[in-house]
Design a protein with these regions (language model features):
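Class I SAM-dependent methyltransferase Rossmann-like catalytic core
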Residues: 1-44
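Class I SAM-dependent methyltransferase SAM/SAH-binding core
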Residues: 36, 41-95
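A short acidic, Gly/Pro-enriched loop at the edge of an enzyme's catalytic core
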Residues: 93-105
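A short glycine-rich, Lys/Arg-flanked "PGG" loop and its adjoining helix->strand segment in the class I
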Residues: 118-133
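Conserved class I S-adenosyl-L-methionine
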Residues: 133-162
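Short alpha-helix
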Residues: 162-185
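Conserved catalytic loop of SAM-dependent methyltransferase domains
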Residues: 182-207, 216-217
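C-terminal lobe and adjacent flexible extensions of AdoMet/dcAdoMet transferase-like proteins
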Residues: 205-278
Length: 278
């Protein structure tokens, strides 16, 4: 029997539950559409340092980014031998990056499964540089998937039906309190939350119409926000320079063929995380 809340799980268990769901048909649909949304936004944004928090290791939404510095932060799970960008294992509310050092930060459903979503958003604001952009992906409660979640039982799969579906307006309010100005939002995945193609085919025309007009009833949304603070002081180190010291301390894992898979092990006592090889 599935537990009634994903928030009772540890970080490793959360990551494995997410990875299992993404490997299925429904999860694959979400991953494909969210990568399409991320690609669309990343093409319009410029930045040297792009970080993703959440998602499945080896399948980052930032794979199409041309930024010279990219990291994918996950909570654990099975790390691939080959990845589009270096992978860091860390907590989503304790990111191993300096303050004001990241140009673009992508949160893939981090708030939906975190025990402390407000702390995750606060940490995202900390590492973003003034003028940096946040791309936040979340499950939409005002969708057919949100209705399906309301009808869920303890026998249903853990994700996404026992995760947190947060209203986009609530996230926007949180962002404003943290000097993150919402700029735009996009929606995707208008099909019914069923893996069987026969059932989905009955509503195909309506699905295409909603997708074409981008009605705000898609299963997922992508919120883009800009960090509003004072501009950089002349002579202040660039984000790339600030992350250079981090990159030097990270050691490639043994047996890597192309891109290194790296681990960051946070200290339990609340001190800054140690950077060690996998």
């Amino acid at each position: 029997m599935a537990v009634q809340s994903v928030f009772r799980l540890g970080l490793q268990e959360k990551q494995r539950a997410w990875d299992r769901w993404i490997a299925g048909r429904l999860g694959h649909r979400i991953q494909v559409e969210e990568r399409r949304l991320a690609r669309r936004e990343l093409r319009r944004l410029f930045g040297q340092v792009v970080i993703q928090v959440g998602g499945t290791a080896g399948f980052p939404l930032i794979a199409d980014s041309l930024a010279p510095v990219r990291f994918h932060v996950v909570f654990g799970g099975d790390l691939p031998k080959v990845s589009h960008c270096p992978i860091i294992v860390a907590e989503d509310n304790l990111l191993p990056f300096p303050t004001d050092s990241v140009d673009i930060l992508v949160l893939q459903h981090s708030l939906d499964i975190s025990t402390h979503p407000h702390q995750v958003l606060r940490e995202a604001e900390r590492v973003l540089r003034p003028g940096g952009r946040l791309l936040l992906f979340g499950f939409n409660p005002t969708s057919s998937w949100g209705l399906r979640r309301l009808l869920s039982t303890p026998l249903d799969s853990l994700l996404p039906w026992h995760a947190r579906f947060m209203r986009r307006s609530q996230i926007e309010d949180w962002c404003r309190l943290l000097n993150l100005a919402p700029e735009l939002s996009r929606h995707a995945v208008y099909g019914l939350p069923f893996a069987k193609k026969g059932i989905r085919r009955l509503f195909k025309s309506l699905e295409h119409r909603m997708a074409r007009n981008e009605w705000p009833v898609g299963a997922v949304y992508c919120l883009r926000a800009k960090k509003e603070r004072n501009a950089y002081i002349p002579g202040k180190p660039s984000p790339l320079g600030r992350l250079a010291s981090v990159g030097k301390t990270l050691k490639p894992a043994v047996g890597m063929r192309r891109k290194p898979v790296l681990r960051v092990v946070p200290k339990r006592d609340g001190a800054p995380p140690d950077l060690t090889g996998a």
